[in-house]
Amino acid sequence: MLATLGTAFLAGNVAATPQAAAPAQPANPLQAQVGQLGVRKCANLFSALGQTVALGSDYSGQVQTEKAAPDAHGVVGVLGMTYKTAAYNSQAAGVVVATPVGTKCEGQLVRVAPFQRACKDVLALLPAGSTAAGALSGVPLYNLGGNQGQAMLVASGNACVVVTIARGADIG
């Protein structure tokens, strides 16, 4: 699976922790939510993508699917995340999607993380082996080292918004 998804500030912290003021949550709140919605087919992939997009953060999220037939439709989650690490101390947002395709499931995640520094300075946080992949309408695109997906670095004044994109699928 994807380890850091493109930013070094996520490396090394594998489990999300509940917020101090929040009531006790299961180890994986997204797994609990899809279970409550009756999602079984893509639940494991969705949960893994959710844990990956939120790696190293305190987070909460909302999950949606077709209530009448949850295993016949995609499941979508939106997450709000707070990071408190030496390299990154800010908020971020994520979107996770898992959809049945035949007998398996495929999914994607997107994370949006603003940095209060120039994009040229954020480049050093990309995983080793990351390479430039061109530009999309002037927005730099990078293939992340370790086959961890892609990242776009969007300049916003003196800040840089990192948009990380990755795919996942059931294996086996």
Task: For every predicted segment, state its role.
Residues 68, 129-135, 141-143, 152-154:
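Short, exposed beta-strand/loop patches in secreted or surface proteins that constitute
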Residues 10-19:
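Sec/Tat signal peptide C-region and signal peptidase I cleavage site
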Residues 21-100, 166-170:
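N-terminal secretory signal peptides
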Residues 41-46, 107-109, 119, 123, ...:
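Short, structured motif recognition centered on aromatic/hydrophobic residues
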